[in-house]
Amino acid sequence: MRGILYFCTLILLEGMAEAVSSSRDCLQAGESCTNDPICSSKFRTLRQCIAGNGANKLGPDAKNQCRSTVTALLSSQLYGCKCKRGMKKEKHCLSVYWSIHHTLMEGMNVLESSPYEPFIRGFDYVRLASITAGSENEVTQVNRCLDAAKACNVDEMCQRLRTEYVSFCIRRLARADTCNRSKCHKALRKFFDRVPPEYTHELLFCPCEDTACAERRRQTIVPACSYESKEKPNCLAPLDSCRENYVCRSRYAEFQFNCQPSLQTASGCRRDSYAACLLAYTGIIGSPITPNYIDNSTSSIAPWCTCNASGNRQEECESFLHLFTDNVCLQNAIQAFGNGTYLNAATAPSISPTTQMYKQERNANRAAATLSENIFEHLQPTKVAGEERLLRGSTRLSSETSSPAAPCHQAASLLQLWLPPTLAVLSHFMM
């Protein structure tokens, strides 16, 4: 009965997610904007504003003009557009997204939106239901990590892409005792983007009770090439490198968004979705900030870096590192996957809150409030009187593009109102 209810819940969630994610993607929005003289002109201006991070070097007048441009584009088809993870021309799509959001989000450590559509990928419902249907004892009595490897070898795509990334990651460069990390990372991203989660999640998050199992799990991403190096760099180096790349910046933003910890929810996740958190986690594997299990004796996860010698960016560095090492949402999601309850996030967190988690909660709330003020400050009539001409110029854009998007926003609102009670009822029957 429990497995059947999970099965029904998954189908329901995917159907609703697809309905909500039917909004315009940023590639389409960019093409529409290019074909509109008014939008196209403002978009070119915005590109100039953020070129080479030049916004920090602009004078007051130039900054005001850039703010005016952003304000006008808030009512265009560009604002609110999303991208799909692993889509064709993903980098191009994300460049359009960040052209708008780079300005709005500048200085924010915690993002209040994800560049990607809230899409639940095609899970194998029968397989997942069978895994989660048994009791916790039944799940942990078998070697799930070994079973995961066997299951991947049976599936053609999983076996082929796994063999491909392992081949790239273990291959040594000629006349050097190092691997080609760039090719290794690219092959890893391809694997986690294309192979269904019922295989990738089982390989990464399988529960272990002995070191042999835990070592197999740790070796999943071939850490000698994809993760480790002779010395641990300061975390700010890979973080800065990530922010300079559209794809990595977006995957990290999705991870922040979907794995954001909270002390206000029973699950420990602000978004109350373990599945979304785990999927976001797999998205940053194969990036400059690739995380992994730190050893074969625990389930602790961290990127390969340290916050020593961070200077005046010490707090920023520690906030980044603690998103992995002290994140109740991520830790609970991994544990819930192990005992077969990760599809039902409405369970009490098994990890006690720490001082750092309280600090993360305060920072998240502060960032959310500041972000809201920054965006809507530009929209107050008393503050945009001088920009009336620009806003008038965008009237046609607003009337043409805001209406089609309205059903998507309404659907999202209805989903937020309807989904929690529905899951609560389902979880009641699963007990």
UniProtKB/Swiss-Prot annotation:
Gene expressing this chain: GFRA4
Family: Belongs to the GDNFR family.
Known partners and oligomeric status: Interacts with ARTN ligand and RET: forms a 2:2:2 ternary complex composed of ARTN ligand, GFRA3 and RET receptor.
Protein name: GDNF family receptor alpha-4
Membrane topology: Lipid-anchor; GPI-anchor
Lipid addition sites, GPI-anchor amidated serine: S403
Coiled coil, from the record: none
This protein's UniProt keywords: Cell membrane, Glycoprotein, GPI-anchor, Lipoprotein, Membrane, Receptor, Signal
Pro-peptide positions on chain: 404-431
Origin organism lineage: Eukaryota, Metazoa, Chordata, Craniata, Vertebrata
